[in-house]
Amino acid sequence: MAAQGRLITDTSNFFDIGPGDTLLVAGRRYLIKGEEREYRFGIEDPKFWVKKAVDGRTGERKIIKLRYDESFITDLGRIKIRCFRNSWKESDILKLVGNHVSFMHGVTYLDDHGNPVRVLDIVRGTNFLNYIGGFRMPHEKYFRTELPGILRKLIDAFQAIAFLHTHGFRHGDIRNDHVIVENGGGHYVWIDFDYEFDLPENPFSLDVFGLGNLLTYAIGKGFHDYYMIRNETYIYHDLADRLELEDFSLLHRSRLTNLRKMYPYIPPMLNNILMHFSRGAHVFYESVDEIIEDLNGYLSSL
């Protein structure tokens, strides 16, 4: 266990930095209160490189992200893609976006050993995963009364990703828990853009497919995987018998993309947007702007 009450100037060993320690960086002191945790699939995982802290000068609560180098391989269809963390990229994006309402805000300092220390403002709100899960109503009512407004907000968020792409950056890890629905104004705010990936042939494709996942989640009021469809027949009835491989996601191969087979009131125009991300797709979106154009076309038809 880390000793308490130490003054930390080297963040290389982030596991050894714990509650009660004070981080000294660029002449500023931050009292460490603990680690952030990630909640996914019912599992709570501590993120030891992401610290909860209090600014010793202002008393404000902050999130501090320390340098953490990791990599893994993911699949896009039959293509294997190396993904990795890049603290410097996130630092560059923080500079680029400034006070842009669609991104988290923060500043990067260097510790005594040259490690980047990102000091982030807390985005107060609910992540998109929980926000959509909070609609306690039948899907058809949700689809007709709530979804149009959600899609308009998503378009704003998608435009923010297009802004990154225009400047040569990728978000790198687009997920429904990396969008925060902000308290008050309701802006959709992107967080956690330190992931990067190697795919020079189509440099923005993982971001584009990540946006497809957000759309699938929003339109379906949750994800619908084959295991659920096959086993929860009291909800899905005979849907499993009517599905083909082409109805599922190219990126997440057991996730239903052809939602019109489940909810026949979804118009073909909207469902066709989703089908660009399916295993049966013959045409894929090459840019965020193409998705935005089709979403605007659908909303204009309502």
Which sequence ranges carry the predicted segments?
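Conserved structural core of kinase catalytic domains
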Residues: 105-146
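Juxta-kinase regulatory segment immediately upstream of eukaryotic protein kinase catalytic domains
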Residues: 1-41
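Activation segment signature within eukaryotic-like protein kinase domains
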Residues: 153-154
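C-lobe/activation-segment region of protein kinase-like
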Residues: 188-270
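ATP-binding glycine-rich loop module of kinase domains
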Residues: 37-95
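Catalytic-loop of the protein kinase fold
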Residues: 161-176, 181
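Conserved HxN/HPN-centered segment at the entrance to the catalytic loop
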Residues: 92-111
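Terminal C-lobe "cap" of eukaryotic-type protein kinase domains
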Residues: 279-302
